[in-house]
Amino acid sequence: MRLTFNQTLSTAAGHPDAAESQEQKLNVTVVFTCVKATVAAMKKAGALAESLGARITLVVPQVVPFPLELTSPPVLLEFQERRFRDIAKLSPVEINVKLYLCRDEMETAKAVLKPHSLVVVGGRRRFWPTREKALARTLRKAGHEVIFIEAE
């Protein structure tokens, strides 16, 4: 297992990285929602990635509230890095963690994903609409293939 940790310290520019666009290896993207749901999504993404010979990208849109500068998140980046390294250790395949400091997590997730990406989103099991289900629906409408995993 190899882990690459990238920190993006600005809002998404609306385009995937040029270096990533040229890579040929299939990518399964997991969008962070909450720890429990993301762990469930990572397990499903790990199984998919193993069977497809793909790698996993964990996209973490961290919302920074307006009173704070975008480069000054309320949670220390070192803490976030440790937390996501621990989550990434659960996967049997290569994982690339991308942390985006942003104002709107849905817009950031839409902006940083390559067109027609395979995305796994974890969420809570509820009868009413949740933030996670809204994210999955938004990404589907944007043209991505989305798998929603319900966490217990």
Located regions from the model:
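Short, glycine/charged-enriched secondary-structure capping and boundary segments
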Residues: 43-46, 72-73, 112, 133-136
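Acidic, proline/glycine-rich short linear motifs
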Residues: 2-3, 8, 12, 47, ...
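A conditional alpha-helix N-cap/helix-loop micro-motif detector
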Residues: 38, 77, 99-102
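Short helix-loop-beta junction
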Residues: 51-52, 83-93
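Structural motif
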Residues: 31-35, 100, 121-126, 151-152
